[in-house]
């Protein structure tokens, strides 16, 4: 089966829910599930390799906080899985690991490192990001670099973002704002990301019952596997409110064929949300307005 014909575009795999940060835009409780054992990660890779070409190491937590991250990356490479590494950029033990053969993209949330609640030296943080950019440039790496900042925080941090951008040729803050993205150098970009709110079971339906708005990529283009092995429809379900099953006890193919999973997918394909968490999620509205 060729990658283009695989069931999912990507599968989110949470290596841990530990990030050590307290970002104002992330209300989710963390440090509950802990680290996914390497043996379970190997099982995950074995079960998803026929379903997707890409695993995105993200739900909660920061994979770069793991001292043995290279072991997980080597396991992914053994199964020929491409890795999208999502990180805050705060916990980088060495740059060499970030250009591991298994990694095809590094996605960095600048909002995490620049959030005042985290009490991080912002200038030193941006300098570290710039140092990695230089390292990647010197290595002529084929890894994609996707730096992201939310549209609601760009102006607040422009005193840091403007000189960062001006470190690269033909790049400016004005150009970033106009285009919504800036090409820094080969396969390296800074993108403005639309601000969203994490879904909440108690939140009001942000779509106002507009059921025909295309809902979600969940179970259509993606699923997420939490660090304890629980499978959920998408990366927004950080607390497993819509648990589909546990990989420790049930094969993934059976979980995806379950009555619950099939019902959710069927409704999504019709532009409808079946679960309360999905009804209260604003992400579909952001996609609709693009």
Predicted regions and their residues:
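Secreted/processed peptides and extracellular or luminal domains of membrane proteins
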Residues: 25, 29-32, 167, 222, ...
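Conserved alpha-helical substructure of the radical SAM core
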Residues: 1-106, 116-124, 288
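Residue-level marker of regulatory loop/turn positions in helix-turn-helix DNA-binding domains and
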Residues: 3-8, 208, 217, 270
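Processing junctions and N-termini across compartments
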Residues: 13, 17-20, 210, 272-275
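Radical SAM enzyme [4Fe-4S]-AdoMet core and its adjacent flexible, acidic
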Residues: 36, 79-82, 97, 101-257, ...
């Amino acid at each position: 089966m060729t990658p283009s014909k695989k069931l999912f575009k990507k599968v989110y795999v949470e290596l841990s829910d530990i990030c050590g940060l307290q970002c104002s835009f992330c209300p989710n409780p963390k440090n509950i599930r802990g680290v996914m054992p390497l043996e379970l990660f190997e099982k995950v890779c074995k079960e998803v390799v026929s379903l997707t070409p890409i695993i995105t190491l993200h739900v909660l937590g920061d994979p770069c906080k793991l001292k043995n991250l290279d072991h997980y990356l080597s396991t992914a490479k053994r199964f020929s899985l491409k890795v999208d590494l999502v990180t805050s950029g705060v916990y980088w033990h060495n740059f060499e690991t970030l250009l591991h053969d298994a990694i095809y993209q590094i996605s960095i949330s600048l909002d995490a490192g620049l959030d005042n609640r985290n009490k991080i030296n912002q200038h030193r943080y941006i300098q570290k990001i710039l140092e990695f950019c230089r390292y990647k440039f010197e290595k002529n790496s084929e890894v994609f670099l996707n730096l992201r900042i939310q549209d609601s925080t760009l102006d607040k941090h422009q005193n840091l973002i403007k000189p960062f951008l001006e470190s690269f040729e033909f790049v400016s803050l004005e150009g970033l704002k106009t285009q919504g993205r800036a090409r820094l150098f080969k396969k390296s970009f800074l993108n403005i990301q639309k601000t969203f709110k994490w879904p909440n079971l108690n939140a009001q339906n942000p779509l106002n019952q507009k059921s025909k708005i295309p809902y979600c990529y969940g179970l259509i283009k993606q699923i997420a596997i939490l660090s304890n092995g629980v499978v959920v429809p998408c990366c927004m379900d950080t607390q497993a409110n819509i648990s589909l099953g546990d990989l420790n006890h049930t094969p993934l193919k059976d979980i995806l064929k379950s009555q619950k999973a099939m019902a959710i997918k069927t409704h999504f394909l019709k532009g409808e949300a079946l679960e309360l968490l999905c009804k209260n999620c604003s992400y579909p509205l952001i996609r609709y307005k693009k």
